[in-house]
């Protein structure tokens, strides 16, 4: 969807209308909703695609090891075609591929969508670890309870407008959020 007004600025740089390679060079990566892995490529090939703009072979290998530490199942399946992975494994691969660009800001769109509860817990633990490693995470997530538990800052959007903001803990404790998004009355 093309924007018809407004601007997108990151680190003092206008991004609206910039080609994808310039956005990646600015340090931004995205893991879109629906996982979108390259089904006919192996896990390893998918991960290496995430680093396609990088020239530092040693850094790429180091980051590949880091992704495998975060997602040991990906290392076990590195030669398996991505299309044969489970939904949770494909989500791990999509996040891992985005990490291979060595982002400063990682945008995750609905990382828990369609996943089993145990896999969701794993994904959120890993998102927290990614953030601890110095990567800023912008998370769009309908699982408000899980998202707010890991959020430093959080926003409630209603029809495209920010209606509430605060720390994750503040919004978790807010009676309006509990009633509208967490299914609990105050």
Q: What does each model-found stretch correspond to?
A:
Residues 1-186:
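Glycine-rich phosphate-binding loops of nucleotide-dependent enzymes
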């Amino acid at each position: 969807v093309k924007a018809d007004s407004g601007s997108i600025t990151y680190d003092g740089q206008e991004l609206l209308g910039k080609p994808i390679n310039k956005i990646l060079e600015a340090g931004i990566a995205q893991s879109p909703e629906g996982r979108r892995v390259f089904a006919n490529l192996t896990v390893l090939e998918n991960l290496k695609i995430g680093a396609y703009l990088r020239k530092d072979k040693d850094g790429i290998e180091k980051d590949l090891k880091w992704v495998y530490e975060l997602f040991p199942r990906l290392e076990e399946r590195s030669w398996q075609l991505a299309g044969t992975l489970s939904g949770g494994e494909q989500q791990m691969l999509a996040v891992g591929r985005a990490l291979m660009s060595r982002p400063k800001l990682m945008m995750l769109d609905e990382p828990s969508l369609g996943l089993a509860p145990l896999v969701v817990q794993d994904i959120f633990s890993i998102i927290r670890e990614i953030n601890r490693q110095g990567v800023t995470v912008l998370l769009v997530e309908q699982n408000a309870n899980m998202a707010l538990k890991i959020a430093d800052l959080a926003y409630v959007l209603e029809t495209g407008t920010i209606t509430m903001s605060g720390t994750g803990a503040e919004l978790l404790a807010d009676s309006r959020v509990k009633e509208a998004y967490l299914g609990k009355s105050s």
